[in-house]
């Protein structure tokens, strides 16, 4: 609510939706959905391709939830009301009933002849996330397990009207700094802000979908602004540890045209113990 810090004697109060800034490219460009439409046109991504990707995301997320893959990285929350207390232990967003038929019936959300719909875009939901980021020396001093180490990071900027392609150059830059190739990555997380946005990045980077977003992403798990970056990094670390893999790559786009990427090395239990006693 604007103008309430100081006394306002006459006139109306305007209530502003702060989320809208995040959905309109920080006021300097088109709505986020239009940027996805722009990428769909530029990279010739069809509605069918977007819906198929959305369905795959839902299927992967539902399978991961059923297999308990997120339990290690999530904290149950008690929600109290007057009548009862509910323990929330799993995400409510993944849709087991998702189907291509249902997805194909949805109307375009951002322009009349568009291809971006509520079904092939990320969900707006609430979440919080956190990690402990420390030097190896400090982690050893505190006796903390070292799950992974950051090898490199990179942040770049692209034109706001195609903001979703930001991860591409960020990935290339982060890999170069790390002295590694995309082929060296054993798990990849590229947030699905929109199916069109992810597919544009997939085409530009020639991503291997078999190792990318293997447990779902923004379309199926939701995209809580401000928490997604930590979420995809944490999920990737636990997936690398489960599968006894080493290198991972995570990247995300951001309103205004930023793209950020990080290359990580997961440390298996024996490596964690070795480092904690160095």
Language-model regions: role of each:
Residues 34-37, 73, 81, 151-220:
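Active-site pocket-lining segment
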Residues 39-46, 51-53, 112-124, 154, ...:
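Cysteine-centered functional microenvironments
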Residues 182, 199, 203-204, 208-212, ...:
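Internal helix-turn-beta structural module
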